[in-house]
Amino acid sequence: MLNEDVMVNAITGSTGAGVKPGATSHFSWRNNNMSIYKPFSHQHVPEIKQSLKQLQNSFDSEIDFIPYRGDFPRGIFATLVVKCKVELEELVKMYTDYYAEDSFVHIIDKNIDLKQVVNTNKCLIHLEKHGDKLLIISCIDNC
């Protein structure tokens, strides 16, 4: 099903930087600011590729991952874009079936935002089709 390159953009709050404080993790630097870090070479790219291969053994396309530092303390807001010929209804059913036993993952039929997940264990996922492109949006509170 996934036979095309995957583009992932993810914006993380300051808590996504881990427990080790750094110059870019402080409010005074992040306030009213946004920046890219480790584009195309982030340490999580191999993990993302491994997860996709576990779901679809034939997956061997590129993963272009662009992480951003956001102007908020908690959460990760991520988008993924890939060419996909499968109809939206079938994709929503696949996602709903896959996460049916996971009480914290919710497939949502309208747009999502971080305020819906901050201070919760929830992961929200929203799917949209635009022509032959699939847009997957997800958000979590990463604390």
Functional labels for PLM-detected ranges:
Residues 143:
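A conserved FAD-binding loop/helix module that cradles the flavin
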Residues 1:
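Short alpha-helices
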Residues 4-140:
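C-terminal substrate-binding/catalytic lobe of Rossmann-fold NAD(P)-dependent oxidoreductases
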